[in-house]
């Protein structure tokens, strides 16, 4: 046992190749390194290429500044996702995910084998994104402690975890899914089908659930049940029921919010604009921040209605519009003359440092797609949300924001949106009685987030317990291996 304890634990971390997953992985890596772990952080070549193109000064190693500022042992490497850099992963979504499903694991396997021959200390633990289907296979082969990192709310994990119940009760994967309230999932008091993740809202009559996305879902949420530990980017006090239901099944630790307000690690896939000068001198809480995240697409018709609605509202705004927000092959999507009409009242940028902008006192609300990182950051900064979910977990996240925590409002109940809806709801969010109620509620949720990460808070306590348990499991595995090696001579 003493020999095992003398070896520094070495964790390999592999986020899913999407910016919203990379960000919490980066911050967890830094935190684990500060607790004495050696970290090897693995990005895909494609993700690294986008980051290095956007941040020319950090083109080689995104953790170089973090290492020099904190003396952390974080090593950085990249691996192919099976496609050339110029392959359009956005336009060829299904083909890309076929590669992630079938090819990517072989590259990870080769990397671990190479590192085990070369690195000191050897890799002893894998922290992989829950959406990977091969984590258990890799960990079994290389005798690694298996940790699954869930970057979304516990409610979403809990629903995916119990897909078998949704199927057997006819709410998912049925020819004509039931439309009544779902009240039989452990830890979920009641949820309507419209609040399920978008992948679970479809029936077999509408969609082929044998496609690659569904094969990934079915395999990933079977594989997570084999993990030694699951860590979640959420807070125990915000989702006690879902977390308790999951914790009854296996070791699950709520360690969120996993982000940093002053990160030195570049994670953006696009060059960032500095909005500080534009915000300077604007009245407190007068600016609406609008962003629909790093992944989801919005139709050109919807972009046009949102643009006109923002102008009609009379509210000042910063609108983050990725170049591929409509599609990588649709460069022009704003209505003619929009930027001129907005004049000094509106700023349009392709990307920015979100935390830097929304923490500015001039910003008073967030018009969002309901990505989980954006929700956590918005609450941290005390901003109410105008919710326009687009896909996957965002519909379920909206339920938490609007129905459970009462810190946001819906943009619309149907998929079709109008400029009048946008204008009216922007004004509701930013001013008046509804706005005041939302801000009071946000402050309560914000206290839960900030209390959780204090030295005696639930997330910090859970993190320290997780670290201790991982160390113990690594030591046990190393001792078992050493025991097997020396047993013939006994």
From Swiss-Prot:
Which Enzyme Commission number(s) are on file for it? 2.4.1.-
Q: Which residues form a coiled coil?
A: none
The reply to whether NADP figures as a keyword in the UniProt entry is: no
Q: Which Gene3D superfamilies match?
A: Glycogen Phosphorylase B
Q: Carries keyword Glycosyltransferase?
A: yes
**Residues binding UDP-alpha-D-glucose, per UniProt:** 294, 352-354, 369-377, 391-394
Report keywords, A-Z.
Glycosyltransferase, Transferase
Q: Name one GO molecular function term.
A: UDP-glucosyltransferase activity
Cited SUPFAM superfamilies:
UDP-Glycosyltransferase/glycogen phosphorylase
The EC class name is transferase
What superkingdom heads the lineage?
Eukaryota
Secretion signal, residue range per the UniProt entry: none
Quote the protein name from its UniProt record.
UDP-glycosyltransferase 86A1
Family matches, as Pfam families: UDPGT (PF00201)
In the record, the note on similarity to other proteins reads: Belongs to the UDP-glycosyltransferase family.
InterPro entries (UniProt xref)? UDP_glucos_trans (IPR002213), UDP_glycos_trans_CS (IPR035595)
Gene name tied to this protein: UGT86A1
């Amino acid at each position: 046992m003493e020999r095992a304890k003398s070896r520094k634990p070495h964790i390999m971390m592999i986020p899913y190749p999407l910016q919203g997953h990379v960000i919490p992985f980066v911050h967890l890596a830094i935190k684990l390194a500060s607790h004495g772990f050696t970290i090897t952080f693995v990005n895909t070549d494609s993700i690294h290429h986008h980051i290095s193109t956007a941040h020319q000064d950090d083109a080689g190693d995104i953790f170089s500044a973090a290492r020099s500022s904190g003396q952390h042992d974080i090593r950085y490497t990249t691996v192919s996702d099976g496609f050339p850099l110029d392959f359009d992963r956005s336009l060829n979504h299904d083909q890309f995910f076929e590669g992630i499903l079938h090819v990517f694991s072989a590259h990870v396997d080769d990397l671990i084998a190479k590192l085990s021959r070369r690195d000191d200390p050897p890799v002893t633990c894998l922290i992989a994104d829950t959406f990977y289907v091969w984590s258990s296979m890799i960990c079994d082969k290389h005798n690694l402690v298996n940790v699954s990192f869930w970057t979304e709310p516990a409610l979403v994990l809990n629903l995916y975890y119990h897909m078998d119940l949704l199927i057997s009760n006819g709410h998912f994967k049925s020819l004509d899914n039931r439309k009544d309230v779902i009240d039989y999932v452990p830890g979920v008091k009641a949820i309507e089908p419209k609040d399920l993740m978008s992948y679970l809202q479809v029936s077999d009559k509408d969609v082929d659930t044998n496609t690659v996305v569904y094969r990934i879902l079915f395999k990933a949420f079977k594989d997570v049940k084999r993990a030694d530990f699951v860590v979640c980017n959420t807070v125990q006090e915000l989702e006690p029921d879902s977390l308790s239901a999951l914790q009854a099944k296996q070791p699950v630790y709520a360690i969120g919010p996993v982000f940093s307000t002053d990160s030195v690690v570049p994670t953006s896939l696009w060059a960032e604009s500095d909005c500080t000068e534009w915000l300077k001198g604007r009245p407190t809480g007068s600016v609406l921040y609008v962003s629909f995240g790093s992944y989801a697409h919005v139709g050109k018709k919807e972009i046009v209605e949102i643009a006109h609605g923002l102008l009609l509202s009379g509210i000042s705004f910063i609108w983050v519009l990725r170049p591929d927000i409509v599609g990588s092959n649709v460069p022009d999507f704003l209505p003619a003359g929009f930027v001129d009409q907005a004049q000094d009242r509106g700023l349009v940028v392709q990307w920015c440092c979100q935390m830097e902008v929304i923490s500015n006192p001039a910003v008073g609300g967030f018009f969002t797609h309901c990505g989980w990182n954006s929700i956590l950051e918005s609450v941290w900064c005390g901003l109410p949300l105008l919710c326009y979910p687009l896909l996957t977990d965002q519909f379920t996240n909206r339920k938490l924001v609007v129905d459970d925590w009462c810190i946001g409002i819906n943009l619309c109940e149907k998929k079709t949106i109008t400029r009048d809806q946008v204008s009216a709801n922007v004004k509701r969010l930013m001013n008046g009685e509804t706005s005041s109620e939302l801000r009071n509620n946000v402050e309560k949720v914000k206290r839960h987030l900030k209390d959780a990460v204090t030295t005696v808070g639930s997330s910090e306590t859970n993190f320290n317990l997780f670290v201790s348990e991982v160390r113990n499991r690594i030591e046990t595995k190393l001792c078992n291996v050493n025991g097997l090696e020396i047993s013939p001579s006994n």
